[in-house]
């Protein structure tokens, strides 16, 4: 089982003076299902895990590094599963140079792995309420060049509690400067951000695309810039890509049902599919020497929420 972070909810901000005690109770709840006693679990540090050391008391991480540590919980780590190298990044430390160094070390130690997968918490190519935040897109533009330079195949993320899958992407880069304060003020106007009502899955857009207000114009220009239209790689044939140069980014929905966020009203160009119906989901990954396949299901009826998606590499057949 791979988790992209936020095994718990409580933080110092939400529970001043009580976060350590309350988060410990939440970790106990997370680990309580009997099935977890017989399954290996690989977790990633999320922002809710990162402000006290309780996370480190529950998860033994192999091949741990001091690189990527935020000084409270541990740094990056890696493991191999079959022919796949999983590199788990603690991006609560935003020092991209450390994550780059860690990935280079992990790859050098495992040169024969066919597939390279990165897991981190923030949805750097997601499609719900956090995905357009400058804090998130800035992290995108610092990390992605290192992912591409190290031939990463797939990046798994969380944070936004809504499912999304991108096109294959390569070469996205920052073109507009925009601050978190500017963004937050406009987001409050635009989509009533926050945990969504059970009856609403996509937030309505309150700011008109033809607004002439300077703040609105700057906001819409920023949103257009982070669509990364030019990064979309034209290698897709149906729900299969063959020998791509770029990377697939997938953001997980909530698997527990404890919290959901709305999809943003203006779906980003880089998104191939997205889904939010306030139902927990889980994804199953199947890997062979030549294929990497993802299926994602609802927990209430085990129906798929997206088509089967497969990456093929090292093959020449015409599909």
Map each language-model feature to its residues:
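Histidine-centered catalytic micro-motifs
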Residues: 118-125, 155-163
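Residue-level marker for buried hydrophobic side chains located in beta-strands
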Residues: 1-3, 43-44, 118, 156
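Extracellular low-complexity, Gly/Ser/Thr-rich intrinsically disordered linkers
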Residues: 84-85, 120-124, 268-308
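Active-site glycine-centered loops adjacent to acidic/histidine catalytic or metal-binding residues
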Residues: 5-6, 46-47, 121, 158-159
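Short acidic, glycine-rich surface-loop motifs adjacent to enzyme active sites
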Residues: 2-11, 110-130
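Extended active-site neighborhood of metal-dependent phosphoesterases/phosphodiesterases
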Residues: 15-112, 116, 134-137, 142, ...
